[in-house]
UniProtKB/Swiss-Prot annotation:
GO biological process: embryo development ending in seed dormancy; positive regulation of ethylene biosynthetic process; response to flooding
Gene behind the chain: NAC047
DNA-binding region listed in the record: 112-192
Protein keywords: DNA-binding, Nucleus, Transcription, Transcription regulation
Protein name per its UniProtKB record: NAC transcription factor 47
Source taxon at top rank: Eukaryota
Source species taxonomy: Eukaryota, Viridiplantae, Streptophyta, Embryophyta, Tracheophyta
Subcellular localization: Nucleus
Predominant subcellular localization, coarse grouping: nucleus
Region (Disordered): 147-166, 200-226
Additional detail: In rosette plants, root flooding (waterlogging) triggers rapid upward (hyponastic) leaf movement representing an important architectural stress response that critically determines plant performance in natural habitats. Plants silencing NAC047 produce abnormally shaped seeds.
Molecular function via GO: DNA-binding transcription factor activity; transcription cis-regulatory region binding
Inducing stimuli: By root flooding. Induced by senescence.
NAC domain span: 10-186
């Protein structure tokens, strides 16, 4: 342990902010090789026997981050994994290891160490609660291991300085060697899960209080008033067509022969059906197919026969309708009965060859 406070020999305004390369070359490598370090500012502390919030009190120097030399124990007697369990929780590795390299003077970079990031969790795995305490663990690369250096000097095989050369788990982990640890608390990190839930709940309440209250009833009357209008537009029945049509003209039209019927009659009847004052937006122009009168080229016996058939079919259909529904009844009764067959006139018009579709 350090018997003398190193801060007493430091000049005013001194801050200890070493780089990763400086920590490896000037502190960790000398500690592992038992060489004197430049300044006794890093204490020897087994960080796995304490909680991270208790470590700042054990550091001889530091304000927002603290440095320690710490040993590592094996998780299993014959294993190569370190034991990350601490006093009231455990350290968990996060991310990938970072290689620390420096130029060797020959235009190449030599790997001198490895940096690993860990996060402290309260409790036991795997149900630990994440905290804001972070640790950066530095360890020497294989090329700087004292065991490798002594083996090379004693006549052993030459050691490749590349970090990827790993011939033994003992040298790759070297759990019996020292590691350098930097401990700090992340200031703007996410809180633990109970605190996060509490903060999130409070923020939601504050946002709901600041939002203007909108009464849903302000929109409902408009929707309710629009529904009858939509129903009126979409509930046009055959009885409405009869209300818009002269019944006397319809009876005469059915009893007349096709020869005496002119194009003006058709246009008059269709014009009444598509009266915009009654149905609006030319409802029947959209629902009924457009009709055209027979062309002037249609002539001869075949056309006359088709007209006679049309007249007979129309008269028979009208007689059946007259027998079933009497004109002696009121207009309302006729409307009710005709609603049972809303497509009667449409079927007669489509079955007839006298009236054809356009398009």
């Amino acid at each position: 342990m350090i018997s003398k406070d190193p801060r007493s020999s430091l000049p005013p305004g001194f801050r200890f902010h070493p780089t990763d390369e400086e920590l490896i070359l000037h502190y960790l490598r000398k500690k592992v090789s038992s060489s004197p370090v430049p300044l006794s500012i890093i204490a020897d502390v087994d960080i796995y026997k304490s909680d991270p919030w208790d470590l700042p009190a054990k550091a001889p120097f530091g304000e927002k981050e603290w440095y320690f030399f710490s040993p590592r124990d094996r998780k299993y007697p014959n294993g190569a994994r370190p034991n990350r369990a601490a006093a009231s929780g455990y350290w968990k590795a996060t991310g990938t290891d970072k290689l620390i390299a420096v130029p060797n003077g020959e235009g190449f970079h030599e790997n001198i160490g490895i940096k690993k990031a860990l996060v402290f969790y309260r409790g036991k795995p795997p149900k630990g609660v994440k905290t804001n305490w972070i640790m950066h663990e530095y360890r020497l690369a294989d090329s700087l291991s004292p065991k490798r250096i002594n083996s090379s000097r004693s006549g052993g095989s030459e050691v490749n300085n590349n970090f990827g050369d790993r011939n033994s788990k003992e040298y790759s982990m070297r759990l019996d060697d020292w590691v350098l640890c930097r401990i700090y608390k992340k200031s703007h990190a996410s809180l633990s899960s109970p605190d996060v839930a509490l903060v999130t709940s409070n923020q939601e309440h504050e946002e709901n209080d600041n939002e203007p209250f909108v009464d849903r009833g302000t929109f409902l009357p408009n929707l309710q008033n629009d529904q009858p209008l939509k129903r009126q537009k979409s509930s046009c029945s055959f009885s409405n067509l009869l209300d818009a049509t002269d019944l006397t003209f319809l009876a005469n039209f059915l009893n007349e022969t096709p020869e005496n019927r002119s194009e003006s009659d058709f246009s008059f009847m269709i014009g009444n059906f598509s009266n915009p004052d009654i149905y609006g937006n030319h409802y029947l122009d959209q629902k009924l197919p457009q009709l055209s009168s027979p062309t002037s080229e249609t002539s001869g016996i075949g056309s006359k026969r088709e007209r006679v058939d049309f007249a007979e079919e129309t008269i028979n259909a009208s007689k059946k309708m007259m027998n079933t529904y009497s004109y002696n009844n009121s207009i309302d009764q006729m409307d009710h009965s005709m609603m049972q067959q809303p497509s009667f006139l449409n079927q007669e018009l489509m079955m007839s060859s006298h009236l054809q579709y356009q398009g």
